[in-house]
């Protein structure tokens, strides 16, 4: 299972990368966490979202937009949800919006939208936060004694 964290920017402060790497380095095969900066996939969703012919997503891929307000899950619920998705999909793509969120026409391409909180977070800080959230779900899925 590959977890892809997409963001339409690059060149973040070193502590952002350090926070992400702290969790990404802990994943073990067959699980993997990847940061996709200046995401071409996200740019294409924006680019083709106004076309009459819908953008075709690859088989085995599932798109999750991080967007507020949306469905909120606690850690165990998210872990169970991701475990179920891993039975059907080989790659999960999490999309972090810009400072203004996701364009409305792009939201229709997401298979679902999730919110981490009713609080608003800066899009850069979402990188290490999502790395921790996905890592926590991963550890619960594999029965690792990480905090619940």
Give the residues covered by each predicted segment.
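Structured adenosyl-cofactor binding patch, chiefly the S-adenosyl-L-methionine
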Residues: 105-148
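N-terminal beta1-alpha1 ligand-phosphate binding loop
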Residues: 1-27
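Short histidine/acidic/glycine/proline-rich micro-motifs that form metal-
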Residues: 9-13, 40-41, 69, 120
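Short glycine-/acidic-enriched loop or helix-start segments at secondary-structure transitions
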Residues: 15, 74-76, 103-106
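S-adenosyl-L-methionine/SAH cofactor-binding core of RNA-modifying enzymes
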Residues: 28-93
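Rossmann-fold NAD(P)-binding glycine/threonine-rich loop
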Residues: 97
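Short, aromatic/basic amphipathic alpha-helical patches
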Residues: 16-25, 48-52, 106-108
